[in-house]
């Protein structure tokens, strides 16, 4: 299983200061997050885009600008950069496991330009994909492949990551 080859964070405590920092480990950062004891995040925003896919355990509840989104196993949410949000991780079970992808704004912009899509296609609100769309287009497989790009030669890593983010943008625009 590919999930074993990516960073795994258990009960990590996110601070507003940490969240607001730029990505430190590259332009596309993927990790598996497990929460057992730490059941809630602080309200935070970050300069990068963030995608979250619950893969085991509890549903997750996100609060965004006064709206509440319940994200069930197999559903995916995409937060644009600078969007304040918080998560509660123990809604339906005591443990939550989520695949989290963080995408730097620079590579997102290059991928968007490469996609050829007009800007009005996406309003900048959170995007939620239901389980059927996530399964049909194998978003989990795409996110797991994105995790593997850290092992690529630096000469091709940026190009592959940009192509994967472009694929992500194009697929989201179709669902």
Predicted regions and their residues:
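A short, N-terminal "cap"/entry segment at the start of jelly-roll beta-barrel domains
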Residues: 1-26
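Surface-exposed loop/turn and secondary-structure junction residues enriched for glycine/proline
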Residues: 17, 99, 111, 131-132
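A ubiquitous short alpha-helical element
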Residues: 14, 123-134
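An amphipathic alpha-helical interaction segment
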Residues: 130-175
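Intrinsic disorder/low-complexity segments
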Residues: 20-22, 32, 148
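N-terminal regulatory/effector-sensing and dimerization cores
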Residues: 24-122, 153-154, 158
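Generic detector of well-ordered alpha-helical segments enriched in charged/polar residues
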Residues: 7, 11, 109, 140-147
